[in-house]
């Protein structure tokens, strides 16, 4: 007992000492204020950086249906291999290959595929192989081919044989279990015996994939606890031209019948060209809706408004922008999507959803029309969408766009038009320097509270280069800390800011076109960036209501390099305070909770690094991660030392 009393006295002395010498005196009004939307913190998916094919979509075969413009791109062939399209297995993907005898007993016919930057194979993992096959032109009674998985030294590590006896297309499957981990393997197929054989839709998935998605990447998303999931883009919604825009109806139904689409990111950046980057659409709208359910996020699909990318096309280009008189098919796509998501199984598109295995509706509540659109071309088209959507589905919220910039003439015009049209939310985008984020923590303090709410749909801090280097745009601690500081302003203004999503989401370490990105991966593993941990800490400590936190009667938004916000969680009956110290010195802070008598014990979660350029990487995943400790209040006052360069969450 005497020891406990001594420790208690020491603790009280320490708290009193901090209290007396505190540099900052924060006051929190504990009366719950504005409601924080469940959608406040979320994720945005776009197929950039090989985020879908070669990433979240777990298919390991590149160009599995031989539909790339170069039909054999991704494949190495040997012997007698030709591409055919006579009497195909799938009308919308008509090309397939024919393997015929090599013409000599010592020669072989076959082909091999290295997947996306090599095939990552895990020891003990089972891989599900499938292919559609038939005897070619009734040549022989049967044909046999061997399927192998091969390591970096060109040694087969597992194989299987498949015998084809029919001249009708049939699906053949086999499971391959590997006994070693391989970073860059390949799949090889040999024709072994008999006449010619036709093959199509050659596929390989890891057994632990979930609805065709990589298990580890799904887990990375689920553990963010996002409230909103925006998909499928982004610029791919628009397309470089209308022919390459994202068309959701091409992404539902059997994957074998989903037509190929060109990915606009395969040629956008001359220094990062990927001519083999296409969209097989195996990761389609049905899968996006399923993933939304899986991770507990509200879906937000975004559709083309009839304008191709305005960066890449002139406003008067009739080939790039649909005329108003021809807009109805685009509007029908939006109406049909809502029916696909929410309609009864007796409806046309509700039946498609049910036939895919989900008779229950997806409970879609909002839809985005257009991506980064600006100027007069956009609002007149958006208005046409809004009239018909609201007439048929008045409960669906509509998200418009303020364009690609955080301010300026086009931004102001966009907001003016969005208010005039009466959209529910306005999508703002800003990829800016850490200084911009630090200087804009009060961005939304003076926004008009009437009219549309804010959706910060794409944002990320792009780090300055060192010395004379260009912007390096890495996911380092400096960027993450500035985002954490800025997000105190999002939280404080939750009455007008309803949702926010960092962008982009995924990047393959060998296949990226854009950085920074929230989650990096190779073919075997992934890494959660420091920015990921900032997003996770906000999402898991979102709360239900804003609490007014002030110092000297004013919001804490960067004076003396400190930022803060506070929320209350009704379900957990918890008070949560977030403090960001971007200074090089520790800050001593008193936080007084007005209206409370005592807080008791709580926990402190700290994200800190002494090195602003510190990163989490595949070879060092936990370089910068949150650390948790206990804390105790003195009555209704919490006295803390906030470490230099840190983001701290206090929860009582």
Model-derived regions, located:
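Bacterial Sec-dependent N-terminal signal peptides
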Residues: 1-25
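Extracellular and organelle-lumenal recognition/adhesion modules and their flexible linkers in secreted
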Residues: 23-280, 298-300, 313-328, 371, ...
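An active-site-proximal structural segment forming one wall of the substrate-binding cleft
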Residues: 176-179, 185-186, 206-226, 281-291, ...
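Catalytic-core region of carbohydrate-active enzymes that cleave or remodel glycosidic bonds
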Residues: 387-388, 394-397, 415-418, 424-541, ...
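C-terminal beta-sandwich/jelly-roll accessory domains of carbohydrate-active enzymes
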Residues: 582-652
């Amino acid at each position: 007992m005497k020891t406990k009393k001594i420790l208690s006295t020491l603790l009280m002395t320490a708290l009193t000492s901090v209290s007396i010498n505190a540099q900052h005196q924060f006051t929190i009004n504990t009366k719950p204020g504005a409601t924080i939307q469940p959608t406040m913190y979320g994720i945005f998916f776009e197929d950039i950086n090989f985020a879908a094919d070669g990433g979240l979509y777990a298919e390991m075969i590149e160009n599995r249906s031989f539909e790339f413009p170069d039909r054999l791109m991704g494949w190495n062939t040997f012997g007698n291999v030709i591409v055919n399209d006579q009497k195909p297995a799938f009308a919308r993907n008509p090309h397939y290959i024919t393997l015929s005898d090599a013409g000599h007993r010592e020669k072989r016919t076959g082909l091999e595929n290295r997947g996306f930057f090599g095939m990552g194979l895990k020891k003990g993992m089972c891989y599900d192989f499938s292919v559609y096959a038939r005897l070619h032109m009734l040549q022989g009674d049967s044909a046999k081919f061997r399927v192998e998985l091969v390591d970096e030294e060109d040694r087969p590590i597992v194989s299987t044989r498949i015998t084809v006896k029919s001249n009708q297309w049939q699906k053949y499957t086999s499971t391959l279990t590997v006994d070693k981990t391989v970073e860059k393997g390949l799949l090889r197929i040999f024709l072994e015996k008999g006449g010619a054989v036709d093959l199509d839709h050659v596929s390989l998935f890891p057994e632990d994939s979930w609805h065709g998605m990589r298990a580890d990447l799904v887990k990375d998303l689920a553990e963010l606890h996002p409230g909103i999931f925006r998909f499928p883009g982004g610029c791919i919604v628009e397309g470089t031209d209308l022919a390459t825009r994202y068309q959701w109806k091409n992404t539902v139904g059997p994957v074998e019948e989903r037509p190929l689409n060109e990915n606009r990111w395969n040629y956008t950046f001359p220094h990062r060209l990927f001519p083999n980057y296409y969209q097989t659409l195996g990761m389609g709208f049905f899968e996006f809706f399923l993933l939304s359910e899986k991770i507990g996020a509200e879906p937000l699909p975004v559709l083309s408004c009839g304008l191709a990318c305005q960066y890449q096309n002139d406003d008067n280009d009739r080939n790039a922008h649909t005329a108003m008189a021809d807009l109805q098919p685009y509007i029908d796509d939006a109406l049909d999507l809502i029916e696909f998501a929410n309609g009864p199984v007796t409806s046309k598109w509700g039946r498609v959803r049910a036939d895919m295995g989900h008779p229950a509706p997806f409970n879609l509540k909002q839809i985005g029309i257009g991506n980064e659109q600006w100027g007069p071309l956009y609002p007149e088209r958006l208005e046409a969408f809004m009239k018909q959507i609201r007439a048929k589905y008045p409960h669906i919220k509509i998200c418009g766009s303020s364009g690609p910039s955080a301010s300026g003439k086009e931004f102001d015009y966009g907001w003016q038009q969005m208010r005039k049209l009466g959209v529910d939310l306005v999508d703002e985008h800003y990829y800016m320097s850490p200084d911009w984020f630090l200087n804009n923590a009060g961005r939304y303090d003076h926004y008009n509270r009437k009219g549309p709410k804010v959706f910060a749909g794409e944002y990320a801090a792009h780090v300055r280069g060192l010395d004379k280097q260009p912007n390096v745009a890495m996911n380092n601690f400096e960027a993450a800390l500035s985002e954490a500081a800025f997000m105190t302003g999002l939280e404080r203004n939750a009455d007008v800011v309803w949702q926010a999503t960092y962008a982009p989401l995924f990047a393959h370490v060998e296949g990226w076109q854009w950085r920074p990105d929230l989650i990096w991966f190779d073919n075997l593993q992934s890494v959660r960036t420091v920015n990921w941990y900032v997003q996770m800490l906000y999402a898991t400590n979102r709360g239900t209501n804003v609490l007014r936190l002030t110092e000297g009667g004013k919001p804490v938004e960067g004076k003396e390099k400190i930022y803060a916000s506070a929320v209350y969680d009704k379900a957990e009956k918890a008070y949560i305070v977030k403090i960001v110290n971007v200074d090089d010195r520790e800050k001593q802070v008193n936080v007084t909770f007005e209206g409370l008598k005592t807080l008791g014990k709580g926990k402190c979660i700290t994200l800190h690094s002494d090195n602003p350029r510190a990163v989490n990487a595949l070879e060092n995943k936990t370089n910068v991660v949150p650390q948790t400790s206990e804390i105790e209040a003195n009555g209704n006052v919490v006295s803390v030392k906030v470490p230099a360069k840190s983001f701290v969450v206090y929860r009582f």
